[in-house]
């Protein structure tokens, strides 16, 4: 882009911002108090809007009332570095108990020998693991972003920032999964330091047991990014990576595990030094303070997962399959029909003949149906991909079951395929969603999900 074009673009952005401010405060330049009040009003507006939306983003969920309560506690104002009993700050006497309990719950829920609950996000957890198990310029194998791999596994993401030399597994586009024979061949040829598995478009379990022989043969550390499926693993409805040859699991804690926006690392301790390396990778490596309020909310979520996790995971997968079937019966091109569409919370739909993923996602947003465009393996343009990604974990959390998936499919179809006016469909979306605004699969079940002062 030329210097003049860049200047014009920046000026347009500035003028647009001034226009929006002037529309909200037409009389004069707003005071700081007015701006703060505006933010509060906009936040209330967002809450009210989402209460009337069908949320289908595969990487989101809603907190339980108990988790939300501790997230909003004084812990938000406090700071901690290090581990319980070995802090660099005073004032953590009570929080030490909370963090220790959270780690204990994580190990119990996932049957793990080790847990670290300090990473502040999934990508921060990935950075910590990378620092723990790989040096810059060492080799790493992973799923390509175009095949559903996460951006943090790519050259432009966390793995690239760490300096890893990245090699992508051969991918079976029809089955939307790693090709196990191709993966074994790649691992034996490349001899990576790290074999990384896991995706952000994750329909089916990775064939870990077929691949682990090659991983062990070359002495690689086996790492599984479970961000999208952590709750399904906890609920015994996906796969069990720590029993299938994986050394380390990382993940965010706010997708199918319906906790706060945070991160977590789990491990088996078969490799010497792994525990201490991960601890150093987390602090001082990838974090300083680790968001005490989120650790407390995660502890509550894990306690709820022990009690409700299996039922929640089972219903989530059942809903995803039902939605895939309903959309397929309406004539939409849902991927992997021959495999039952999915074994996770996610389905993927090719909407290229209906204008592509970007157009469909924008039109659905106007109808209060919230999902995202997504690249499919045969796409080359991430801005205008041919697919959409749909996750049902939040609808499940709000009490929907298989019967409601038919109505969700019908509403999507009317906008995406029949090209009905989004404003017309929006009225039905709002009426439909009003019956599903309370949180389920948790303590204090039945309280509102989107209450805001």
Where are these regions (language model features)?
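PLP-dependent enzyme catalytic core of the Aspartate aminotransferase-like
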Residues: 10-15, 21, 318, 382-453
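A short glycine-threonine-serine/GTX helix/turn-capping micro-motif
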Residues: 56-58, 281-289, 397-399
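N-terminal glycine-rich, Lys/His-bearing helix-loop that initiates the first secondary-structure elements
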Residues: 2-101, 213, 434, 439-453
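Conserved small-domain helix->loop->beta segment predominantly found in fold-type I
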Residues: 302, 313, 317-361, 371-386, ...
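Short, conserved charged micro-motifs
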Residues: 273, 354-361, 398-403
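Short Gly/Ser/Thr- and Asp/Glu-enriched loop/turn motifs at secondary-structure junctions
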Residues: 51, 120, 293, 338-345
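Flexible, glycine/charged-enriched surface loops at secondary-structure junctions
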Residues: 84-85, 114, 289-292, 309-315, ...
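Conserved PLP-enzyme active-site core in the AAT-like
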Residues: 16, 21-25, 101-333, 351, ...
């Amino acid at each position: 882009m030329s210097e003049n074009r860049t200047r014009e673009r920046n000026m347009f952005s500035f003028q647009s911002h001034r226009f929006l401010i002037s529309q909200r405060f037409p009389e004069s330049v707003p005071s700081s108090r007015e701006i703060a009040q505006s933010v509060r009003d906009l936040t209330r507006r967002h809450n009210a809007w989402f209460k009337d939306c069908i949320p289908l983003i595969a990487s989101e969920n809603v907190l339980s009332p108990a988790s939300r309560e501790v997230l909003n506690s004084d812990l938000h104002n406090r700071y901690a570095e290090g581990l319980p009993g070995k802090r660099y700050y005073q004032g953590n006497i009570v929080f030490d108990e909370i963090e220790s309990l959270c780690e204990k719950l994580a190990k119990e829920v996932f049957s793990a020998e080790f847990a670290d609950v300090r990473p502040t996000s999934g990508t921060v957890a990935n950075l910590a693991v990378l620092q723990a198990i790989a040096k810059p310029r060492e080799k790493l194998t992973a799923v390509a972003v175009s095949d559903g791999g996460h951006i943090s596994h790519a050259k432009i993401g966390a793995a690239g920032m760490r300096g890893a030399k990245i090699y992508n597994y051969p991918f079976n586009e029809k089955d939307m999964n790693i090709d196990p024979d191709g993966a074994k061949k790649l691992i034996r040829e490349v001899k990576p330091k790290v074999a990384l598995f896991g995706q952000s478009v994750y329909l089916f379990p990775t064939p870990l047991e077929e691949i682990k022989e090659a991983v062990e043969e070359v002495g690689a550390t086996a790492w599984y990014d479970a961000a999208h499926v952590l709750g399904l693993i906890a609920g015994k409805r996906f796969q069990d990576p720590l029993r299938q040859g994986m050394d380390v699991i990382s993940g965010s804690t706010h997708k199918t595990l319906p906790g706060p926006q945070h991160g977590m690392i789990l491990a088996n301790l078969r490799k010497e030094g792994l525990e201490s390396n991960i601890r150093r990778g987390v602090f001082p490596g990838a974090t300083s303070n680790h968001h005490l309020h989120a650790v407390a909310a995660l502890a509550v979520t894990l306690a709820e997962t022990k009690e409700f996790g299996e039922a929640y995971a089972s219903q989530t997968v059942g809903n995803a399959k039902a939605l895939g079937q309903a959309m397929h019966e309406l004539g939409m091109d849902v991927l992997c029909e021959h495999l039952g569409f999915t074994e996770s919370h996610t389905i993927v739909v090719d909407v290229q003949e209906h204008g592509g993923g970007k157009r469909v996602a924008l039109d659905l947003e106007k109808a209060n149906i919230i999902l995202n465009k997504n690249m499919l393996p045969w796409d080359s343009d991430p801005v205008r991909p041919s697919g959409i990604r749909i996750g049902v974990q939040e609808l499940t959390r709000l009490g929907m079951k298989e019967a409601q998936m038919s109505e969700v499919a019908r509403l999507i179809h009317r906008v995406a395929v029949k090209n009905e006016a989004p404003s017309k469909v929006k009225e039905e979306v709002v009426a439909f969603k009003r019956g599903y605004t309370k949180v389920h699969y948790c303590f204090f079940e039945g309280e509102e999900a989107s209450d805001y002062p």
